[in-house]
From Swiss-Prot:
GO terms for cellular component: cytoplasm; EMC complex. It is a peripheral membrane protein. Residues 4-150 form the MPN domain. Its main location: endoplasmic reticulum. Disulfide bonds: none annotated. It is found in: Endoplasmic reticulum membrane. This is ER membrane protein complex subunit 8. Component of the ER membrane protein complex (EMC). EMC8 and EMC9 are mutually exclusive subunits of the EMC complex. It comes from the Eukaryota.
Length: 210
């Protein structure tokens, strides 16, 4: 599987989703720009080798994560939005309810495998709640790849952020200003369709702090 990187915007929104619902399990989707066809002669791992860059994060649900009808509605709407913006659903993230549980459960593996049917380099990202602090001192994620029909954890020491010092600084600033209170997930959108799950205000805040 190619390398995986998250933009500051994608990482921060994932962190804010967990911060808004600290006592619940939360999940969401990660989107990447549509890839151009690769040239076959490029060497693996060489300078021309590609990686998946998650440019944005779409928060899905909090609390109960396994309701299939709601997930289908979300996937359909988000897939349509991705096509309009030349994106593709390329990953799934989840934070479990229990603080010390950072392993993917059946729901996480099932949704990620569903995404992998349409995007071969899908990543499953688990948020490690034990590393979650208001100062965001270290990255809080574990990245899993689909290998031989199983989800396996990638190197935990690898830097999966496109610019970690920036992501650390901005996520800490957003937490300090309680920006998570304005974050909208798909559950919030289903409660009131005026709630925008693309979170334009948070996107602007991240851009302003960059």
């Amino acid at each position: 599987m190619p390398g995986v990187k998250l933009t500051t915007q994608a990482y921060c929104k994932m962190v804010l989703h967990g911060a808004k619902y600290p006592h619940c399990a939360v999940d969401g989707l990660l989107v990447a720009e549509k890839q151009k066809p690769r040239k076959e002669h490029l060497p693996l791992g060489g300078p021309g080798a590609h990686h998946t860059l998650f440019v944005d994060c779409i928060p899905l649900f909090h609390g109960t994560l396994a309701l299939a009808p709601m997930l289908e509605v979300a996937l359909t709407l988000i897939d349509s939005w991705c096509k309009d913006n030349s994106y593709v659903i390329a990953g799934y993230y989840q934070a479990n309810e229990r603080v010390k549980d950072a392993s993917p459960n059946q729901v996480a593996e099932k949704v990620a495998s569903r995404i992998a049917e349409g995007f071969s380099d899908t990543a499953l990202i688990m948020v490690d709640n034990t590393k979650f602090t208001m100062d965001c001192v270290v990255p809080t994620i574990h990245v899993y790849e689909h290998h031989e029909n199983k989800w396996r954890c990638r190197d935990p020491h690898y830097d999966y952020c496109e610019d970690w010092p920036e992501a650390q600084r901005i996520s800490a600033s957003l937490l300090d200003s309680r920006s998570y209170e304005t974050l909208v997930d798909f559950d919030n959108h289903l409660d009131d369709i005026r709630n925008d799950w693309t979170n334009p205000e948070i996107n602007k805040a991240v851009l302003h702090l960059c």
